[in-house]
Each structure stands twice: as C-alpha cells, then as structure tokens.
Amino acid sequence: MTDLVTFQGRKAREQVAFAKVKREFERHGYLVAPLALNRSETFAEAERLLCIANDPPLLFMVMCLPDGVAFHPEKQIGYLFEVKAPKPNRSTVSIRLRDLMALTLWQALIVVVTDSEIKAAFAKDLPTPECIIVPDEPPTAWDYGALEWTKQVYPDAKVLEDIAVEFGSRAPYAVWSLEAFASLDFYL
C-alpha cells in the first residue's frame, strides 16, 4: 500500500497519477513529457534560497513550473498541466497558494486524479475555494504574497488562520471540492 502521509509517499502517488494522466492525453493523440514533476528533488537547494528571497518573481515562476506539458500535433493545442493526487476517498483537493498563483500565471490546467476518474480545470477558472488555510507557522515572503494575491482573487473565501498542520507543506493553501473540476475529456 502506498504511504499516504510522508513526502516520499505523496511523491509516489503523484508519479502514479502522472502516468495515468499521460496515458489519457496520449489516448487522445497528445504527446506528453514531464516538465517539473520531480522539482522537489531537482530544485531542493534553490527552493531553500527562494523561500528567504525578498522579491523572486522569475525564480518563483521556475520553482512553481507545472508537472508536465502535452501537445497535440494535429490540433496544434498544448497544455501545461499540474497533477494533483488527493488521498483515496477524498472529495476535496488542496493547492498551495504559491503554486496556485504560478499555475494561474502559467495558464496551466490542474489535473486531479481520484480513485475512479481524472478531472481538470484551468487554474484561472477555479471558483471560490471552500476555504483558505493558513498554518500556524509564519509564512515566507513569497507565501505571504501568494496569500494576499489569493485573498484579492477570491475575496469571499473563508480564511482559517493559525491552523496546526501535521503533515505536508506548512505553506498556506486553498481547498476545493472535486465538483469544481470537469472531466479531463472536456479539455481533450
């Protein structure tokens, strides 16, 4: 059984989810390649520096590069896409706010792989999240910027502050119902 809690377990789930997404794109005639699927490993040293940088817009965009790229040669349609693999039996998906901001700038498709289906939505088209969660640890400068940006984009979102987070990133994130996403086939 895949470890659902540790960093390595989450990354293993993402690898499996990416393979499913790749097969689905390829089934529709797309060419697919990973872009920044393993960025946590390849950018580990840079990420540490970016978290303390005052104004890192260019590096921020590189650090939050989407997981993959898909291109349909006949239709001349391409997508940058980010794969999310929520825990089994979940009806929600969470996205770090700094990732959401960058994925919106990249005009990326967020692809969510559940136990039974593959869903997707453009980052820029997501509705107001169910909530924004701000962990009890102080945000980095870029996480604070992403939090302020998200509050402007979604002024009606409920913000829960000082929340203890046991596992995963301590960066602020937003939570959406899976109902906010359409079938991936809609985009293909």
Question: What label would you give each PLM region?
Answer:
Residues 13-21, 99:
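Conserved alpha-helical elements of sugar-nucleotide-dependent glycosyltransferases
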Residues 42-43, 89-90, 118-122:
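Short catalytic/ligand-binding loop motif for oxyanion handling, primarily in non-cytosolic enzymes
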